[in-house]
UniProtKB/Swiss-Prot annotation:
This is Chaperone protein DnaJ. A zinc finger (CR-type) spans 130-208. The keyword Zinc applies. GO terms for molecular function: ATP binding; heat shock protein binding; unfolded protein binding; zinc ion binding. One of its GO terms (cellular component) is cytoplasm. The gene is dnaJ. It holds the Pfam family DnaJ. GO terms for biological process: chaperone cofactor-dependent protein refolding; DNA replication; protein refolding; response to heat.
C-alpha cells in the first residue's frame, strides 16, 4: 500500500515553514497520542505523524523527500545515498519537542496501572438515600516485598547493557539512523538481574482487596463513581489506575423513577372515584394521606411535592406522582349485581348524557360516523 504524503499527514503545504510544521505536529500529536486517545488506530496515526515531522523538520531529509518522495528513505534509494555521506543520525525529536507536553524523554516511562470497573446493583431505597457498601475486587497490587521495583531486596535494577541506560537504540532505516525503544529493557534503561522471588521481577502481585465504597444519595442507573488510585498498581512504581463503580438500580415493585421524580399507580374503587374520599399512599418516607376529589377519572395524576428523589448534585428534591386507576369490581354477589343494574338505569344506561359525558360524546361520535357512511 502506498505511503501517505508527509505534507498531507501534517495538513501543511509543501512551502510550509518549520514553525508551521512544528505547530501542526504538536496539535496532531496531542490529539492522537496513545496516552490520551484510546481509539484503535490512534497509535498508528501517532507514528505516522511523528515520522512525517522527523522528515520535514530536517533540511537534508526534506530536500531528499521533495525530490525523490518516499524512495529516498528506502534501502538502496538514490544510488547508495549520494550527497548524504555515510548517513545522518536522527536527534530524539520526540523528547525535544513533545517531552514538555507529556513529560517524555529518552527513557520510556513505566506504564500507569489499568483502570478497573465494578458493577454495583442497588435497591431504589439505597440509591435514593445513599449507602456505604463493601466490595471485593481482584486486582494487581504493588509487591510488598520489593515495593514495586521488581528486584530482590538488597539488590537494585542495573543499567541495560544494550542501550547503556538510554532506553533507546539506533536502527538503520534507509540512509538514516533512527532511534527506537530498546528491545532488551523495553525502553526503561534498566533491567532486573536478580528478580524478586515474590513477584518474579514484575513489581506487582495478584490480590483480592476489599474496599468500602460510599454511594451518595440520589444516584441513578448509569451513574459512575470514580475511586482515584484504587485500580491496578502501575509497573515498577508507576501510578495506580482508578476504580470506576458503575451503578445499576434494581426495579422496584411500587415505584418507577424518571429523573428525580417517582411515579406509582394507586387503585381506587369506582365508588370512591365518583364520590371522593381519602386513601393512604406509600412514599419512601412512609405512608401519607391523599385526598381524592369526587368525579376522579382513571389516569389522573396527583403530585406530592418533595416526596421524590433529592438530586445527587444537591439542590431541589423531586416529587411523587400518583396515577389513579379506577378498578372495576369483580366477584359480585347477586345483591351487588342488582344494585349496579339499578344504578345503571338511574344513570340513563351506558350512554347517559348527564352522568357520563365522555360516554355520551363517544356514542354520539359513533352514531355520526355510521350515519355518514350510509349517506
Amino acid at each position: 500500500m502506498a505511503k501517505k504524503d508527509y505534507y498531507e499527514i501534517l495538513g501543511v503545504s509543501k512551502t510550509a515553514e518549520e514553525r508551521e510544521i512544528k505547530k501542526a505536529y504538536k496539535r496532531l500529536a496531542m490529539k492522537f497520542h496513545p496516552d490520551r486517545n484510546q481509539e484503535q488506530d490512534a497509535e498508528a496515526r501517532f507514528k505516522e505523524i511523528k515520522e512525517a515531522y522527523e522528515i520535514l523538520t530536517d533540511a537534508q531529509k526534506r530536500a531528499a523527500y521533495d525530490q525523490y518522495g518516499h524512495a529516498a528513505f528506502e534501502q538502496g534509494g538514490m544510488g547508495g545515498g549520494g550527497g548524504f555521506g555515510g548517513g545522518a543520525e536522527f536527534s530524539d525529536i520526540f523528547g525535544d519537542v513533545f517531552g514538555d507536553i507529556f513529560g517524555g524523554g529518552r527513557r520510556q516511562r513505566a506504564s500507569r496501572g489499568s483502570d478497573l470497573r465494578y458493577n454495583m446493583e442497588l435497591s431504589l431505597e439505597e440509591a435514593v438515600r445513599g449507602v456505604t457498601k463493601e466490595i471485593r475486587i481482584p486486582t494487581l497490587e504493588e509487591c510488598g516485598v520489593c515495593h514495586g521495583s521488581g528486584a530482590k531486596p538488597g539488590s537494585s535494577p542495573v543499567t541495560c547493557p544494550t542501550c547503556h541506560g538510554q532506553g533507546q537504540v539506533q536502527m538503520r532505516q534507509g540512509f538514516f539512523t533512527v532511534q527506537q525503544a530498546c528491545p532488551h529493557c523495553h525502553g526503561r534503561g534498566q533491567i532486573i538481574k536478580d528478580p524478586c522471588n515474590s513477584c518474579h521481577g514484575h513489581g506487582r502481585v495478584e490480590k483480592a482487596k476489599t474496599l468500602s465504597v460510599k454511594i451518595p444519595a440520589g444516584v441513578d442507573t448509569g451513574d459512575r463513581i470514580r475511586l482515584a488510585g484504587e485500580g491496578e498498581a502501575g509497573e515498577h512504581g508507576a501510578p495506580a489506575g482508578d476504580l470506576y463503580v458503575q451503578v445499576q438500580v434494581k426495579a422496584h415493585p411500587i415505584f418507577e423513577r424518571e429523573g428525580n421524580n417517582l411515579y406509582c399507580e394507586v387503585p381506587i374503587n369506582f365508588a370512591m372515584a365518583a364520590l371522593g374520599g381519602e386513601i393512604e399512599v406509600p412514599t419512601l418516607d412512609g405512608r401519607v394521606k391523599l385526598k381524592v376529589p369526587a368525579e376522579t377519572q382513571t389516569g389522573k395524576l396527583f403530585r406530592m411535592r418533595g416526596k421524590g428523589v433529592k438530586s445527587v448534585r444537591g439542590g431541589s428534591q423531586g416529587d411523587l406522582l400518583c396515577r389513579v386507576v379506577v378498578e372495576t369490581p369483580v366477584n359480585l354477589n347477586d345483591k351487588q349485581k342488582q344494585l349496579l343494574k339499578e344504578l345503571e338505569e338511574s344513570l340513563g344506561g351506558p350512554s347517559g348524557d348527564k352522568n357520563s359525558p365522555r360516554s355520551k360524546s363517544f356514542f354520539d361520535g359513533v352514531k355520526k360516523f355510521f350515519d355518514d357512511l350510509t349517506r
